[in-house]
């Protein structure tokens, strides 16, 4: 969220890594870690979701979660973090808009070039990515946020959505406002590798593998240089 929300420039400009925002993130992450603001559980592990409950061995160890939209629909990760329907924190969470809008992930649909069903495959892709009627039905059935601004605008204006995981709050209004502020101009083909290298370097610093901010920065730069060989890393 910090990487893709706080940066105003792409990771790579004119073939060179732009690490100007990294120092602030390293300092912030280490301070939060040292003050106990970070639970220490790794995202998507068995120890992570139970920290959202108010009972059990991992109870009350987190203030909140960063989730993708599919995780806050019925049957998603948030429901597990609440202990399921009737759980100790079921319906007690709320969704808020963060100080910056950010983006991550996505789903790729690929078609085998020698398929015998090219027409059907094309229809499927169109239906899933551009057919407003189909996307509206998906929103209504799944409670997920789709990549169609018109559909989501109509959904939020209807005001009929009520998410029991948030005690009846309409998550779509919050998500729509946040998504509308996303700046995709900073996206690059290198984001996944560079973000992962930054996370690994900062985790090592917080866990004592490296001992200073300079060491953390150098570890990050070395990792990017090894992983992304077609850019300049200085």
Residue ranges and their predicted role:
Residues 34, 167, 173-234:
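Conserved C-terminal helix/tail region of periplasmic/extracytoplasmic solute-binding proteins
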Residues 11-46:
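Glycine-centered hinge/linker elements that transmit conformational signals in sensory
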Residues 66-75:
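Beta->alpha turn/N-cap motifs
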Residues 35, 79-145, 150:
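Extracytoplasmic/periplasmic substrate-recognition and gating elements
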Residues 1-12, 103-111, 171-172, 193-203:
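Periplasmic solute-binding protein
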Residues 46-65, 200, 204-209:
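Short helices/loops that flank or line small-molecule/ion binding pockets
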Residues 9-21, 67, 97, 112:
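Short beta-strand->loop
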Residues 30-37, 113-116, 126-134, 143, ...:
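Sec-exported extracytoplasmic/periplasmic mature domains
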């Amino acid at each position: 969220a910090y990487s893709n929300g706080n940066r105003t420039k792409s990771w790579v400009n004119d073939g060179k890594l732009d690490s100007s925002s990294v120092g602030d993130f390293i300092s912030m992450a280490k301070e939060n870690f040292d003050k106990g603001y970070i639970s220490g559980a790794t995202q998507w592990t068995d120890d992570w979701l139970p920290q959202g409950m108010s009972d059990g061995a991992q109870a009350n160890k987190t203030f909140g979660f960063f989730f993708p939209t599919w995780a806050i629909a019925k049957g998603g990760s948030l429901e597990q973090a609440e202990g399921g329907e009737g759980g100790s924190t079921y319906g007690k969470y709320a969704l808020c808009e963060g100080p910056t809008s950010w983006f991550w992930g996505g789903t790729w649909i690929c078609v085998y070039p020698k398929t015998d069903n090219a027409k059907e495959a094309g229809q499927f892709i169109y239906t899933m990515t551009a057919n407003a009627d189909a996307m509206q039905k998906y929103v209504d059935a799944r409670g997920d946020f789709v990549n169609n601004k018109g559909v989501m605008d109509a959904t939020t204006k209807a005001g009929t959505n009520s998410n029991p995981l948030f005690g009846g709050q309409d998550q779509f209004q919050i998500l729509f406002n946040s998504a509308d502020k996303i700046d995709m101009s900073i996206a690059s083909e290198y984001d996944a590798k560079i973000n992962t290298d930054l996370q690994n370097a900062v985790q090592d610093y917080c866990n004592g593998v490296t001992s200073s901010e300079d060491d953390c920065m150098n570890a990050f730069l070395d990792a990017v240089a090894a992983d992304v060989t077609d850019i300049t890393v200085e």
